Amino acid sequence: MKKHIIVITTGGTIAMKTDPVTGGLVPAVSGEDLAAAVPGLSSWADVDVVEFSNVPSGWMDTEKMLSLARTIDGLADKADGFVVTHGTDSLEETAFFLDMTLHTEKPVCVTGAMRGASDLSADGPENILSAVRVAASDRSRGMGVLVCLQDRIYAAFDVTKFHTTNPDTFRDLHYGPLGTVYSHEIIYGRRPIGHLRLHPSSLSAKVWMVTCWSGMEGDILRAAGEAQLDGLIVDALGCGNVPPKCKAEMMKLGEAGLPMVLTTRVPSGSVMEEYSYDGSALSMKKSGLILGGHLSAWKARLLLAIALGVTGDREEIREIFEKFAH
């Protein structure tokens, strides 16, 4: 018996065509038309389509992400699994958010495209077909939210977009893909390291990101301190090191009780207490700094916003990051 899969469309390049006047891609394809363009889709699953939105993924925000999560949970009793089509610019953020906040354990697979629907060799239809097959597979249950493009399956927690235009743009730079979509089966080589779920009462926290550079002054961090933030991500050099003038401002923010998470701008690897010189992660430990593990700054920002919707206690937030990010 075929599985019932609900495809929820949100927009993105996958639902765009070239505007004949401007020559650029614009939203133009409905959810139903997206599904209709996939050859042989009905042979793999019974598919229904829900059009959540049709916007570029740069327009997504945490409120829309939360609404999407609630839409999926609200339909969970009516489907065996879900596919979410999404623009690739912020796909990894929405997938990560869903992985952190969904109640359902039914398979959820997020996909997109790097070429518009009117482009030569559009990659959207194949990616949708593969994602539907992933969501319909019994092997996908309990794997957390998945991301599937170019027949590779990734954990939402670890995946990232690493090229601006190449269709083969998604990677897990730490552990590699979870599995692969083959012509007749889905094969997983490993399971995700693990995931927990948080259910925030609100998402009103104001969380900024600041990226460090060599010779950076402390004025940006001073401005962050004056902005009445609820939390701050500092994207540091190396394995978690900042210029000395930044460290001084961060210590002040920490003493004022601001939850701060330290991430690294390096694409692969983790923040660690490797050094003890002035500006190292170890030298700032007394400020209450939270280490972000191998989370990117943008995923750490989401996790901090979600955590702040659950608790305002900095030590409880630290415990959440230790469970999720390490």
Where on the chain are the PLM-derived regions?
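Accessory alpha-helical/coil subdomains and C-terminal extensions
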Residues: 2-4, 8-15, 30-31, 36-41, ...
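Short beta-strand segments
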Residues: 8-10, 84-86, 109-112, 144-150, ...
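ATP/nucleoside-binding phosphotransfer catalytic cores, i.e., glycine-rich phosphate-binding loops
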Residues: 244-326
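Internal gly/pro-rich beta-alpha loop/helix module
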Residues: 110-182
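Short acidic, glycine/serine/threonine-rich loops at helix termini
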Residues: 18-21, 95, 120-123, 154-161, ...
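Gly/Ser/Thr-rich loops at beta-strand to alpha-helix junctions
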Residues: 12-15, 87-92, 152-153, 238-241, ...
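ATP/NTP phosphate-donor binding region
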Residues: 1-73, 248, 268, 291
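Short Gly/Thr/Asp-enriched flexible loops that form oxyanion-binding sites at enzyme active sites
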Residues: 85-106, 242-251
